[in-house]
Amino acid sequence: MAFRIDKLTTQAQNVVAEAQAQATSAGNAEIDPLHVLSAAVNQRDGITTPLLEKINVDVPKLKSLLTSELEKLPHASGMGQARVSAKLQAALEASATSAESLKDEYVSTEHLLVGLARTDNKAKNLLSLLGVSDNDLLTAMSQIRGSARVTDPNAESTYQALEKFGIDLTQLAQSGKLDPVIGRDNEIRRVIQVLSRRTKNNPVLIGQPGVGKTAIAEGLALRIFEGDVPQSLKGKKVVSLDMGALVAGAKFRGDFEERLKSVLREVKDSDGKVILFIDELHLVVGAGNAEGSADAANLLKPELARGALRCIGATTLDEYRQHIEKDAALERRFQPVFVGEPNVEDTVAILRGLKPRYESHHGVRITDSALVAAANLSDRYIADRFLPDKAIDLIDEAASRLAMEKESVPEPIDRLQRRLRQLELVHRQLVDEQEASAVDKRVEVEEEMESAKAELASLKEQWETEKMGLDDVQSVRQEVDQLQHRFAQLDADAKEKQLRGESPEDAYSEMLQVQSRLRELQARIDEAEKHDDSADQTKEEPGDEKRRLLRKEVTEEEIAEVVSTWTGVPVTRMMETERAKLLVMEERLHQRVVGQDEAVTAVSDAVRRSRSGLQDPNRPIGSFLFLGPTGVGKTELCKALAEVMFDDESAMVRIDMSEFMERHSVSRLIGAPPGYVGYEEGGKLTEAVRRRPYAVILLDEMEKAHPDVFNVLLQVLDDGRLTDGQGRTVNFTNTVVVMTSNVGSQVIQRVTEEGGGEDEMRQAVEDALKARFLPEFLNRIDDTVIFHPLQQTQIRRIVQLQLEELRSRLAANGLSFEITDAAIDQIAEVGYDPAYGARPLKRVIQREVQNPLASAILKNSYAEGTTIKIDHDGDQFVFSG
């Protein structure tokens, strides 16, 4: 029969074209069957190599034989285009006959191989040498293709679809690449029950991100591998569908559907041996959808309904509602299995099960207290994620930090190396100097360099020794991990043999050997850890400064460090220096805030309660309403608090409530609702706290805001939480909420001038508050703090504080100043106004001190290093220097 080139599939055409290119470049006059076989074997992503491997052909050996045979073919330079040889023509016709006998519409690559094996040529001789016949090829073809026929030019892309577009979880379980699944027994049992149904045997796992939906599918694969499943599921495979691979490269309409159909066909042809797992099930709805074509969900529906396809889906609650529930026909084919978030106790159990894997991977020891801390701290401080995922991430990152210290230079060595480089730079510049001072300095630098080099050498030696021990323990842990997996494999084999009525003696014999080796390795690990512990205790004795450079175990302190890095909340154990700072917090605040003892004490007590762990975990650290006249230190106390807590006064969320005078402006705090402009941007308050959960929140000038704004704050003050416009819950439990107001300031001023008592003032202020704010708002505030008008003595102290700021600015110009008591008294007297507080002082200092000094500096009146004396002679300020 005549052979038609247009009846070749795309891949087969590529093979023939490549064979022609090989023949032409080698100077062969004809395209030989050897060229075609060589092109087929070397084709990337082709069907030839898997086909030959199926019948146990040594493909590398075949390639080397082909190379040597091709070199023997006659060749000459200057040859034109190579033509098809008579033997290749016969082979092509035989391949067309093979396709026709199998009812295929196109000649695919495997038909070319059959044609080569059926006709008399050198390619057949090579295949025969390796024990390959045309019948072997046909048998392997039927195994790879299944019931599929070649009906289009891209048929090869649909072969072995499950291997190309799926990940065999059961195979991963067998090779020990899946983490153990702890707990979740009820959910796995429910999944098995649904899978065992006759029809609609398709469970869908629904739960929040990170609760372990995919882990349940992996747990099922592990149970199948271990034989811990009902008889109906024994020997089955769980294959995870890779939607990315399925969609990638599907250029033309219908490509995606063709691939999916081939996957479904292979699952059906397996006679129930394959359970399909579709992670992110919502991606299937609409996948491949285009005008006039069916999406993946519509291809799945008939198979799901008939029970011909067993499928496990996994998706989140939101995605299930948005995508699956909308399609009622798809929804009814799936049986929901809800996967809830585990509690802290269950999370600790999960972490204990995963602990050996992470110890083996990172080469560090993880203490049990670290696992408990990871579960507790992640539950309390990481509000926008779910257990156990966030707790596992904490353990992983803390362990990776310690593992990284082995690879990178420890901090003491790094610090010494940098210091040594600085000294070498100074030394190079002093080498040629002859001045006595320079010579002395050079000798001093040389001595310091020698000392630093000696210390560096000692530290490097210690680091290498410690690192060597760590590497040894890590390799032992990895061997333990492998042996434990081997033990599980042998156990599963023994159970399988017992079920078949065979003797499992061989398996039990090897299990005893593995168990013995495991005991040896565990003893080595215990001995190494005991040695490390005793070494650590010896090194930490008083007076011995040599400490470990590399930490070998993850403790709760390392977990707390990671939480602090993620959230900014200081949950690490307090050092003695921090304890001392907190105990004298009032003194530190009074360095900036003059007077106002009641306010300073209230704020300090709240912070101490929080850091000592006695704070209610469901409320903010503290919520205060600061009342008093303008300029008495309300905002300044907030800045001082931020500086004490974060070493940065700008580390606070400051919101001017005068911007929220209209009723609708409340949406700016929490974000616009859906459908309004700005919905995606989030709220001014909620976004600030999401980014910095540990903060001082200052709501300035509260009485200027619309009363409806206070309603938003009720949940913040009572429950420490607020839901923004996008439905996300923002955690305020690690914030200090301070509201300032001038309500009652006239009353405070009047009572102070009249010499009234504290009780009279508080009662008058409370009456003014009740008239302005809602009772439910006032009732949720921890403390209402009254700021008293400043006295003359306090004003004098504020003058000194503000002059200290001026002193630091003058120091940049190489100048300093001394100021007399007369000058300070004059500034305090001129700048004191009970109605305006301390703010006029800045204007007086600016006018009377800064302006004359600025003019003098511009005129070069004072040489660098001059100390300027500032006095007041009764009429004006006098500057001399």
Swiss-Prot record:
It is found in: Cytoplasm. ATP 2 binds at residues 628-635. Residues 392-530 form a coiled coil. Keywords: ATP-binding, Chaperone, Coiled coil, Cytoplasm, Nucleotide-binding, Repeat, Stress response. PROSITE patterns: CLP_R, CLPAB_1, CLPAB_2. Residues 160-341 are annotated as: NBD1. The keyword Transferase does not apply. One of its GO terms (biological process) is cellular response to heat. It comes from the Bacteria. Residues 84-147 are annotated as: Repeat 2. Pfam families: AAA (PF00004), AAA_2 (PF07724), AAA_lid_9 (PF17871), Clp_N (PF02861), ClpB_D2-small (PF10431). ATP 1 binds at residues 207-214. GO terms for cellular component: cytoplasm. Residues 578-789 are annotated as: NBD2. Its main location: cytoplasm. Part of a stress-induced multi-chaperone system, it is involved in the recovery of the cell from heat-induced damage, in cooperation with DnaK, DnaJ and GrpE. Acts before DnaK, in the processing of protein aggregates. Protein binding stimulates the ATPase activity; ATP hydrolysis unfolds the denatured protein aggregates, which probably helps expose new hydrophobic binding sites on the surface of ClpB-bound aggregates, contributing to the solubilization and refolding of denatured protein aggregates by DnaK. The Clp repeat (R) domain probably functions as a substrate-discriminating domain, recruiting aggregated proteins to the ClpB hexamer and/or stabilizing bound proteins. The NBD2 domain is responsible for oligomerization, whereas the NBD1 domain stabilizes the hexamer probably in an ATP-dependent manner. The movement of the coiled-coil domain is essential for ClpB ability to rescue proteins from an aggregated state, probably by pulling apart large aggregated proteins, which are bound between the coiled-coils motifs of adjacent ClpB subunits in the functional hexamer. Homohexamer. The oligomerization is ATP-dependent. PANTHER family: ATP-DEPENDENT CLP PROTEASE, HEAT SHOCK PROTEIN 104. This is Chaperone protein ClpB. The lineage of its organism: Bacteria, Pseudomonadati, Planctomycetota, Planctomycetia, Pirellulales.
